[in-house]
Amino acid sequence: MAPCHIRKYQESDRQWVVGLLSRGMAEHAPATFRQLLKLPRTLILLLGGPLALLLVSGSWLLALVFSISLFPALWFLAKKPWTEYVDMTLCTDMSDITKSYLSERGSCFWVAESEEKVVGMVGALPVDDPTLREKRLQLFHLFVDSEHRRQGIAKALVRTVLQFARDQGYSEVILDTGTIQLSAMALYQSMGFKKTGQSFFCVWARLVALHTVHFIYHLPSSKVGSL
């Protein structure tokens, strides 16, 4: 296993980072597709649609063509929330990472580098909400290249964010992840994050029953030990 070190993002990392984001989102489409196929409304469509068409038209061929054509449409639906997220992100905070994450104190973006390749990343931005009683940091875009997983890189990146939050005087760290991202949820919970709720991040996610789970990590000011 090649050594890996975590450092701040540089502009020369952009191509690597965008690639990680795109690949990381795309790899969730198959699991989303399998989940979509199990939904009651999908089963009704897959079974009832062709049957209804057969009864109306009397054509087995037409019913078969309709049934087969449903699968590309469902695959499109499974991919859409993830492509939508990538497009949205590349138009907002990831459009200029240096400006969004490194131009002001209290925010940062890190990459994990191994053998001169960026194999992981994570960002952190302050939560701008005047109604909050506590100073809160939000973790964004935790990704590790598929070939470098199970090496502790994701945990090291999360620890980097938590330590940064301590150093900057934050009281809480929050993040969002999908219900379909089981390994990510297990990681966060093993590190002390607690669920606070769930929602849908876009209409496409609602269509495929893809919930976003919200987590929080409390950093009491009196706690000075290691993570």
From Swiss-Prot:
Lumenal topology ranges: 64-227
Q: What does this protein do?
A: Endoplasmic reticulum (ER)-membrane-bound lysine N-acetyltransferase catalyzing the N6-acetylation of lysine residues in the lumen of the ER in various proteins, including PROM1 and BACE1, using acetyl-CoA as acetyl donor. Thereby, may regulate apoptosis through the acetylation and the regulation of the expression of PROM1. May also regulate amyloid beta-peptide secretion through acetylation of BACE1 and the regulation of its expression in neurons. N(6)-lysine acetylation in the ER maintains protein homeostasis and regulates reticulophagy.
Q: Biological process GO annotation list?
A: amyloid fibril formation; glutathione metabolic process; peptidyl-lysine N6-acetylation; positive regulation of gene expression
* Main location per the UniProt record: endoplasmic reticulum
SUPFAM superfamilies, alphabetized: Acyl-CoA N-acyltransferases (Nat) (SSF55729)
* Species name: Homo sapiens (Human)
* Keywords for the protein's UniProt record, in alphabetical order: Acyltransferase, Endoplasmic reticulum, Membrane, Signal-anchor, Transferase, Transmembrane, Transmembrane helix
Q: What is this protein called?
A: N-acetyltransferase 8
What membrane topology is annotated for this entry? Single-pass type II membrane protein
Reaction(s) catalysed by this chain's protein: L-lysyl-[protein] + acetyl-CoA = N(6)-acetyl-L-lysyl-[protein] + CoA + H(+); an S-substituted L-cysteine + acetyl-CoA = an N-acetyl-L-cysteine-S-conjugate + CoA + H(+)
- For the Cytoplasmic compartment, the record's topological domain ranges are 1-42
Q: What class of enzyme is it?
A: transferase
Concerning its family, UniProt says: Belongs to the NAT8 family.
Localization of this protein: Endoplasmic reticulum-Golgi intermediate compartment membrane; Endoplasmic reticulum membrane
MF terms per GO, please? L-cysteine-S-conjugate N-acetyltransferase activity; L-lysine N-acetyltransferase activity, acting on acetyl phosphate as donor; N-acetyltransferase activity; protein-lysine-acetyltransferase activity
In what residue span(s) does the N-acetyltransferase domain sit?
61-220
| Pathway annotation from the record | Sulfur metabolism; glutathione metabolism
Where does it sit, as one GO cellular component term? endoplasmic reticulum membrane
| Induction comment from the UniProt entry of this chain | Up-regulated by ceramides.
**Lineage, please?**
Eukaryota, Metazoa, Chordata, Craniata, Vertebrata
Membrane-spanning ranges: 43-63
Query: Mind telling me which CDD domains this protein's record contains?
Result: NAT_SF
What does the tissue specificity note say? Preferentially expressed in liver and kidney. Also detected in brain (at protein level).
- Enzyme nomenclature, EC number: 2.3.1.-, 2.3.1.80
